[in-house]
């Protein structure tokens, strides 16, 4: 967080430059201060602010022209500052809002001809069962959506009351909840519009949904309004109102906004059709898919955190889907007759899926009692709702398939998406000492494009970041961040060949393996470290000791791991020699353009400690490395090597209890020769 308000003032002042004496700069700074509190570091705030791009200055209008338009210019755009457009192309939304106007008539919508033709960046929001929320909570959700709109993220909200289609009053109840959402938004100073006639139901057996006209939706969005759509469809031909699934509405909107709703006719010219679709795609960018559901984020019965904080769909969709289906199949048989030390029942799935020995584990082979899923906290893991969780995950998977890789989704409970989420909901927590305020996951995600908590943090660190002073106060993470993500390639595949010390002292693979693109790996290392690698020296050093390689995506991130012998231990291939080999993280790399976003580092780190080397790994880092804070949070232990500039990290259990293991780790971390061209044979 920031040391003092002047930090954020300086950050904002670097991009907000106004030539007008009438612009409420202090109000703008206060607005950004409240939002950037959702960013955990100054680097994240700077990263967000750096996305503001200056626009080309437009010729100044003469005074008569300005007078004819009926309001004075605020000079936001003219000064080269784009408060929303630099990030989302929506300067008009913020510039046109009453908060930034100085006369009574300024709250009125702009004429259509003045609306910007820049790309419109949209968040598709589905809110489930709003009827379960009181007016105060719904009002705070409306406030968050209003703030997203002010930041240039136009919101299109789909109401999902979850009513059975047999409900006689489904239409009135759906419209009532849509109107409640409208009131909640407008209470916070942003206009909204209910659109209950934009969805058509095809007469085909599949009853596919489509959008009547994209302009009916885009027009209010371009003018800074928030669109609210109830799950009402109209049959083609008869125009009879019928209930439709909110998930299908979200998918129909996604297809329409991506230009995939265009229906080709036999007489269409293919080139003209492609040009038209391309133009439609440039008009709109769906950047976020947001699901607000009382069920919350995707649960996990295999992790100490009880939840999936980040889902890399490319890698994990099938695995998590199977896990949720297992939960659905278990049904009421989830609860066994077994009880923990507190006399509470535990889940059978926990017994059949014990935790792996990974960095998340907090020093015990079995699930700690304070993290067990008991009959008293069944609602916290949503045991009856596995099917709903599967539906939410499937919706994001299907929708993100239509969208570019930069788009992302988030699932959260409505209460955590309110601006009062930092207030303790449980009076018993009032005395708990917390060092960090709870973040609004929607605002945090907008600012950082990351989940509110890192996916590679151990469960104990999640407790600390949640402001919990004891294990018993640990809360399940209610939000799940979802990306289309990237494939993860492991050499060798641990499902086929377990990563273990080589026999006869030689590794079964090298970096010259034809499956490895060595030039791209070298480029990844050099880009990440910003140093030139002595490739031949590096190959000679790791060729006979390579444990494996982890590659994320198209060499966007990766890790090189080796088996190292401590000083004085002969490399004779004996069992004694193999037992002393240390699993060592030689290189942990992420391309500069992927650092701090996309979850690349988390994906690689999780693969290392959960799949490849679950028993532990060690590594070293220079003491002045800015990444050390990230390492400290994920390591089980650290040690500043005396007489050197190195800090040693490890994720292995019992390192401090076994003196020889600790000395082996220290000896390896002291003795590794660097392979950089600037000091290629010098040990620090």
From Swiss-Prot:
Its EC number is 2.3.1.1. Residues 414-439 are annotated as: Disordered. Keywords: Acyltransferase, Amino-acid biosynthesis, Mitochondrion, Transferase, Transit peptide. It catalyses: L-glutamate + acetyl-CoA = N-acetyl-L-glutamate + CoA + H(+). Pfam families: NAT. One of its GO terms (cellular component) is mitochondrial matrix. PROSITE patterns: GNAT_NAGS. Pathway: Amino-acid biosynthesis; L-arginine biosynthesis; N(2)-acetyl-L-ornithine from L-glutamate: step 1/4. It comes from the Eukaryota. InterPro entries: AceGlu_kinase-like_sf (IPR036393), GlcNAc_Synth_fun (IPR011190), Vertebrate-like_GNAT_dom (IPR006855). Residues 505-674 form the N-acetyltransferase domain. This is Amino-acid acetyltransferase, mitochondrial. It comes from Ajellomyces capsulatus (strain NAm1 / WU24) (Darling's disease fungus). The gene is ARG2.
